[in-house]
Amino acid sequence: MRALVLLAVLLIAGCAERSAPGVTVLTYATPYAPTHPFSRADRDWMDWVERESGGRVRIVPFWSGSVLSSEHSMTELRHGLVDIGTITPIYARGGAHLHRAQSGFYGGTSTIPQQLALYRCMQAADPQFAKELQGLKVLAVQGGNLPGIVTRDRPVRRLEDLQGLRLRAPSELLSVLRHLGADPVDMPMSEVYSALAKGVLDGVVAPADTLRSLHFAEVARYFNAMGIPRGAYAARAMGERRWRSLDPELRQLLERSIEVWERALEVRILAAEEAGLRAGREHGIEFYQMPAEDVARFLKIYESDAEARARSLARFGIDALSTFRFARRIAAGLMETGEIDCTRSTNEPTA
């Protein structure tokens, strides 16, 4: 692994543009194509950094997984494969147990700013977050549109319609869907279009933006917009060693750029949802809403499952249960006041 990383670093160094005197060149890599909404937000951020630096910074992008992998991106950044990259700790196979579990702690949040605020509350309260991201400097936290249920041949009007459906779903929803009688699987989203087209999958738990961005409107017929809770996660980062090598003025610029990058992601993600809904209507997708009583039942199962997964991390020496309960207190306050309050008393009951 170390030899492969070293070889890749040398190859990238050869591909990166040579910098003029006084210009710092930073490399950026992502698994997404340059036309993906995430990549459009990345480009917005790059343009801002280069403009604000007065030409003292150039960012060289590597798109479409040409350099950085999805599964090992955090390790690759720590080794300096590239300077900055997209990371997905919620999908990491190991070493990010709390990040994976916390993605199911977001019941009650409905907007991207709420998702980011709750993530930062938990991050500030639990040092395990920083431990799992050791060796990285986080440059953006990302939330997302609330998923619905896309299906091929059978509409989902109520929870009982999930029975027997083979659905691709994120890991935090697998046991919830099994409880409801579905047959959920976890597979890369890049494989879902083909699986839907061939009938290997009956559907996928995904937000409306995928109707266009992943072309699901071409191979599906129904969308239930039930708004399943989803979490935020550290999504863009720089290797810590590279971060420390930068001059203080450039580090300050990149610190200021965090808000810019997160806002660009939010704007592009929301625009993608509108585009997805339009694409769905153009392709004749039938849209449904889940009845309120079914949503309440789903959220109860979702919360119970999240608590069970938090308890299970005790075997790794991680007290995720305290973080789960903290998140539930914050969510209860959100329901009462409409605001995320990280200081909500630990003596208050959970929702």
What are the residue ranges of the model-derived segments?
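N-terminal secretory/targeting leader peptides
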Residues: C15-Q115, K131-E132, L136-A351
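Hinge/lid segment of periplasmic solute-binding proteins
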Residues: R120-Q134
